[in-house]
């Protein structure tokens, strides 16, 4: 099943745009409206599974929190394990962490040290690609554990915020179903 223009337009139309959220001047792309539409949600998962079904993926990693909503069903569809990457203090076993920059300050992500094995071929999944900082930190965690990651998949790409280019510099090919301008 290759995505048709009609299917991609359906997905795009299922994502509501909220003006001035979370602050004035921002046009927020609300993927939760896609989740409310079972046809759109299933289609988004099916299209990602179809794209990666023959890629030799052994693990899917999803970033907190909306990456879980797409990553886990993609992992099931591919017949592989799902690994959550979370904010500090949310994972019960031994973890490693990676700090990354935000617009105003820094944040941190963690992964269980035993979640990725050396040689695992990992697909990173998240709901949205903006600047790429969260995904870059996630990729660093996976690589520190010996995993191989060359691809990241998203529902939405805010194409003018530089995320694709940032990931390209890390050797990551990004794929998204729905492009939107970031402003």
UniProtKB/Swiss-Prot annotation:
Coiled coil: none annotated. It catalyses: AMP + diphosphate = 5-phospho-alpha-D-ribose 1-diphosphate + adenine. One of its GO terms (biological process) is AMP salvage. One of its GO terms (cellular component) is cytoplasm. InterPro entries: Ade_phspho_trans, PRibTrfase_dom, PRTase-like, UPRTase/APRTase. Its EC number is 2.4.2.7. It is found in: Cytoplasm. It comes from the Bacteria. Pathway: Purine metabolism; AMP biosynthesis via salvage pathway; AMP from adenine: step 1/1. SUPFAM superfamilies: PRTase-like. One of its GO terms (molecular function) is adenine phosphoribosyltransferase activity. Keywords: Cytoplasm, Glycosyltransferase, Purine salvage, Transferase. Catalyzes a salvage reaction resulting in the formation of AMP, that is energically less costly than de novo synthesis. Homodimer. Belongs to the purine/pyrimidine phosphoribosyltransferase family. This is Adenine phosphoribosyltransferase. The gene is apt.
């Amino acid at each position: 099943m290759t995505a048709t223009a009609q299917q991609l337009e359906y997905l795009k139309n299922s994502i509501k745009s909220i003006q001035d959220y979370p602050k004035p001047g921002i046009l927020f792309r609300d993927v939760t409206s896609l989740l409310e539409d079972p046809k759109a949600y299933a289609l988004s998962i099916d299209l990602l599974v179809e794209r990666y079904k023959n890629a030799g993926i052994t693990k899917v990693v999803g970033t907190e929190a909306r990456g879980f909503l797409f990553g886990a069903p993609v992992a099931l569809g591919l017949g592989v394990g799902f690994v959550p990457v979370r904010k500090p203090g949310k994972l019960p076993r031994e973890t490693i962490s990676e700090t990354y920059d935000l617009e105003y300050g820094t944040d941190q992500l963690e992964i269980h040290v035993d979640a990725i094995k050396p040689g695992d071929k990992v697909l990173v999944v998240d709901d949205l690609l903006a600047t790429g900082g969260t995904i870059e930190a996630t990729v660093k965690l996976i690589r520190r554990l010996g995993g191989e990651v060359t691809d990241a998949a998203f529902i939405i790409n805010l194409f003018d915020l530089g995320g694709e280019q940032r990931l390209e510099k890390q050797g990551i090919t990004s794929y998204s179903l729905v492009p939107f301008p970031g402003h």
